[in-house]
Each structure stands twice: as C-alpha cells, then as structure tokens.
Amino acid sequence: MKYSVSPVVRVAVNAKNPADLPKLVSGLIKMSKADPLVQVINTETEHIICGSGELHLEICLKDLVEDYAKIEITKSDPVVPYKETVTSKSSQICMAKSPNKHNRLYVIAEPLNEELVKEIEEGNIKASDDTKITARKLIDKYEWDQHDAKKLWVFGPDQMGPNFLIDQTKAVQYLNEIRDSMESAFQSVTKEGILAEENLRGVRFGIQDVELHNDSIHRGGGQIIPTARRVYYASEMTATPRYQEPVYLCNIATPQDVMNGVYQCFSQRRGVVFSEESVQGTPLLEVKAYLPVSESFGFTAHLRSLTSGQAFPQSSFSHWDIINQDPFDVKSKAYEITMEIRKRKGLKQELPVLSDYIDKA
C-alpha cells in the first residue's frame, strides 16, 4: 500500500543512559515496523525519527518510551528537512581538474520539470523501468532531446531520487571506465547538497565533456570521485540554487464569525488561505489553506486560541515549495535557514565559495 504521507518533521533521540543504546536501536526498529508512516535513520552520531507532523512525532516518542524501547530518552527540538534545488541552467560550463592534474571534467546543472519530479516521487517513473520506456516518456511527454533521454545514466540519491545524471558528451574515450566513479560522486552530492548538505530535488546534471589520461592508473576512483563531487557542486552553485520547503494542506471547519482569527493565524505563519466553502446544512465553512511545515509547530493551539476553540484543523503534506530567495544574501530568510542547518550539523558557518570548486583552464 502506498501512503500519501511524507515524513516532513524529524527529531533526534538518544538513550539517557548510554548503556541502554542497544535497547533504543532495537526499539526504533520495532517502531518503524509497527508504523509504516515512520521513517527511522540510524547514523553513527544520532538516531532520527521522521514523522508526518508534530502530533505524530509526539505519539511515536511516547510509544518508543512506553512500549518499544522501555527506556528513558533525550530528544532534540523537532526539525524540518529542506531540499536544495536549482532554478536556472548553469551560467557557465564548470570544469574541475583531478588532484594529479591529468583529468578534466566539464558539467552543467539545470532544473527538472516539477511534474516530472512528482512522477518520480510517486513511483510512475522508476530507475528500475526499462530504459527505452523511460526515454520514450521523457521525449514524448517532457520534450527531451533524444540524445539526452537515451543517455540518462542514473537517478539519485539512493539510485531512485528525483535527480538525474546525463551523459551529454560526444565520442569521448574511456568514459565508460570512469562511469562508476561519476555515478558514485553524483549519489553523494544529491544526498548532501552544497548549501547545507540537504537532499537535492529536481536537479539534472549534464556531463558536457571529459579529458582523461591515457593510462588507467592515472584516472582511478581516487582521482575522479573527488573531482566529480567538486564539479557537481560548482554546477549547482552556478545554476541559481534555492531551497524548497515542505508545505501542509490544512482543512479547517470553522464558523463564519471567527474567520478573522483564521486569517490572522495563517498570515502570522506565512500561510495562504485559498478556498472557503459553506458546508451544506451547517453554519460552518470549510476552509483550505497552505501552511509551511516549519511554521506549523504550535499551530493548532494558536488557531484554537484565536477562534475561541471553534476552528478544527486537519493537516497533511501537500507539496514542496521554492523559497525564492538567494541563500547567499545575508539579509534573506534562505540565508538564515542555511546558517541554522549548518550550525545544527556542525558545518562551517561560512558559505562555500565557487572558486574552491572550479578550476581555470
């Protein structure tokens, strides 16, 4: 069964007593099996529970403590994942040289059509599909160039995400010998983008050209993988990078006389009311609105207080929305988001500089 719920709120948990760590890991595994809407990510440094919302996470944590792990835990504040994307074609063909200076890679990035991205996320276009069928769909429905459609190498991250790596070269020697290295770097970059190591979404990387050393010993993975990572990052940076944030669709049943409170609540949280309809046979209105997930914490209590407890909201994940601000502009909300995420992840507080990722001929 496919659930139309996306895990868009996450919290990091740990055992209060380090000796209880095995019980925590075991409890997390049991919980993820019991609740198909929960996603658990175990890393060396932290254990993350991803749920569909604030209330869902509260229930998960209660179940973890009382039923699955039966231990005391510590938890972080809830965090919303963002996606990194690009909004234009790279302003230049980016070139990076390998550490030994014997190999050069030329790459550009550009955005994928949003409808195509949704098809991938909904499983209508999969990496496991026949390549000829996928190519035909890209050509017919999305008006792709035939050469590009037939030379789609791989999806990412995790071989299945909504980003593509395409071979746009013409008659290049030894290209197939470095394909695994190029793909490995692509998987890594689409999992951790340049801005704040968030997943990429809707980015197509096109390999324009490669210049490789004749001797295979000089073009192994140790030379190609770090070079490919640099050039992919450079092409993301030159293609107007932006964040995408998750957005809830909120359905609210409310009497007409407290609508001012509904509008006030959404306007204070960057939300947008887009529909109001009378519910037949009742004095209620059915209101539909979009609300950024990052603004949803405490939303229900806030709405109830502004409407004297008369508005009843239900929220579900709707879509990813572009935050159309430059993350490199220190006055922007996007810059603020970048700094928050980088601080949380223990990354440098300075933003990356293009000259560190690109080489001159």
Positions of PLM-derived features:
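Accessory interaction regions appended to the cores of large information-processing enzymes
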Residues: M1-A361
